[in-house]
Amino acid sequence: MSRTVFCVLLNKEADGLDFQLYPGELGKRIFDNISKEAWGQWQHKQTMLINEKKLNMMDPEHRKMLETEMEGFLFDGKDVVIDGYTPPSK
């Protein structure tokens, strides 16, 4: 049976993550408050950020910038802005 959490991003009860995917206190906060669906949304945005901004995950500054974007997206409702990207119209 999967665990459920009240997802702060989606503002609803949803399936929680199976295990803590990120280290430290931030990882615990994500595990306790973010659903699988919301984490999937973040992974999509993260991939776009890494590719479009040509981030190097070996660079501590790039990792810190990505972590800041992640916190803003998951907990503060800030959308990820990528210069020159226009989302497809629905």
Swiss-Prot record:
One of its GO terms (cellular component) is cytosol. Keywords: Iron. The lineage of its organism: Bacteria, Pseudomonadati, Pseudomonadota, Gammaproteobacteria, Vibrionales. It holds the Pfam family Iron_traffic. Belongs to the Fe(2+)-trafficking protein family. This is Probable Fe(2+)-trafficking protein. GO terms for biological process: cellular response to oxidative stress. The keyword DNA-binding does not apply. It comes from the Bacteria. One of its GO terms (molecular function) is iron ion binding. InterPro entries: Fe_traffick_prot_YggX, Fe_traffick_prot_YggX_sf. It comes from Aliivibrio salmonicida (strain LFI1238). Could be a mediator in iron transactions between iron acquisition and iron-requiring processes, such as synthesis and/or repair of Fe-S clusters in biosynthetic enzymes. The keyword Iron applies.
